[in-house]
């Protein structure tokens, strides 16, 4: 009888504690508590758009004016993850201007049935590092141009991470696109 009573008592205790509602965990504090600053995001997007337009216009002076003097740039090709500076980026852009005509940028993620937004910022996941600021812009699009020497039209899908400071200057930029794909398009036999 004592065994049955002890068993019923243990079952009651287990039921009581297992049915207790969990209290909210401190981890829930990662929820974004303030609304995102859309005007800050819009200003930074405008800077990057203007930078891309200056590249299309082959205006090296305008490009230089939009870059902070101490900006850091990561080129699209692998270089041991070494960050380069403003003059390196301007030299690369000047090389494109010297070798390509009719440089154009089409903003957005090309999907099977549409083109999605080309600028993103902030995050929801992972929760422990969720962020609703426009600190780093994620940029998606497609560049096209005419290779000057061969007359061939080239195109490349493009992804970039850019940061813009309070002065409206680009302070960090990391490019991702298929550099070798450009060469393959130029060298391809028709």
Protein language model annotation of sequence segments:
Residues 15-18:
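C-terminal motif of bacterial Sec signal peptides marking the signal peptidase cleavage site
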Residues 4-7, 20-190:
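C-terminal and inter-domain tail/linker signature
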């Amino acid at each position: 009888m004592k065994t049955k009573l002890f068993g019923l008592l243990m079952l009651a205790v287990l039921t009581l504690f297992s049915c207790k509602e969990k209290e909210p965990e401190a981890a829930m504090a990662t929820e974004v508590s303030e609304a995102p600053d859309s005007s800050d995001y819009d200003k930074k997007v405008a800077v990057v758009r203007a930078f891309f337009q200056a590249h299309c216009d082959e205006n090296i002076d305008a490009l230089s004016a939009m870059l902070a003097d101490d900006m850091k740039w990561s080129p699209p090709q692998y270089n041991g993850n070494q960050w380069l500076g403003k003059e390196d980026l301007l030299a690369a852009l000047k090389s494109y201007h010297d070798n390509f005509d009719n440089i154009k940028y089409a903003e957005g993620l090309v999907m099977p049935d549409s083109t999605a937004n080309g600028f993103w910022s902030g995050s929801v996941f992972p929760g422990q590092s969720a962020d609703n600021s426009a600190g780093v812009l994620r940029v998606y699009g497609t560049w096209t141009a005419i290779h000057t020497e061969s007359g061939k039209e080239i195109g490349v899908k493009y992804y970039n991470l850019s940061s813009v400071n309070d002065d409206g200057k680009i302070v960090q930029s990391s490019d991702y696109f298929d550099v070798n794909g450009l060469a393959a398009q130029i060298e391809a036999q028709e």
